[in-house]
Amino acid sequence: LAERSQKDGQAINAFCKRLYDHTFLAKYYYQKPEKIGRGTLQSAPNIRRFFAGEWLEWFALMKLLAFFQERRRAVSCTRNLSVIFPNEDLHELDVFFLVDGATPVCIECKTGEFRQEIDKYLRLKKRLGIDRSQFILCCTGLSDEQAAGLSGMYELSFVSPAGFVAHLSKLF
């Protein structure tokens, strides 16, 4: 944390302490002179899944529920929906929802590298028979400019977590 501002370092250290207090971290030490924080993630599978990207699925789900509640729109949704196609191909959809019982939207959440999976998502969108605006890849680390560029290049909608609600606003 030595390369961070004092304010940022304090915020990161406080956040790590909260993770430790809430047992997400099995260990956490802050070496003040060196300004180094060291933490060990809990070994519990649900904790590891959360930090492996499940947090973004929960983020997307909670944001979309709040979005539709504010607009008083009927929405049904699920996380980790397993879809089996007629040829018995199995796919898991991170977040899937229906608006007003009719409009399907699929959200795939990516916290790491996603570029090698774009073809997979293009095929999945086609098999689901939904419009590009309704197949959303919510990817951490994307700027609005990058998301717009990728959305223009592929028949998918790319958004950052910060741009997720704005995309929903365009759809609904």
For the regions a language model picked out, list residue spans one by one:
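Intrinsically disordered, low-complexity Ser/Thr/Pro/Gly-rich regulatory segments
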Residues: 1-172
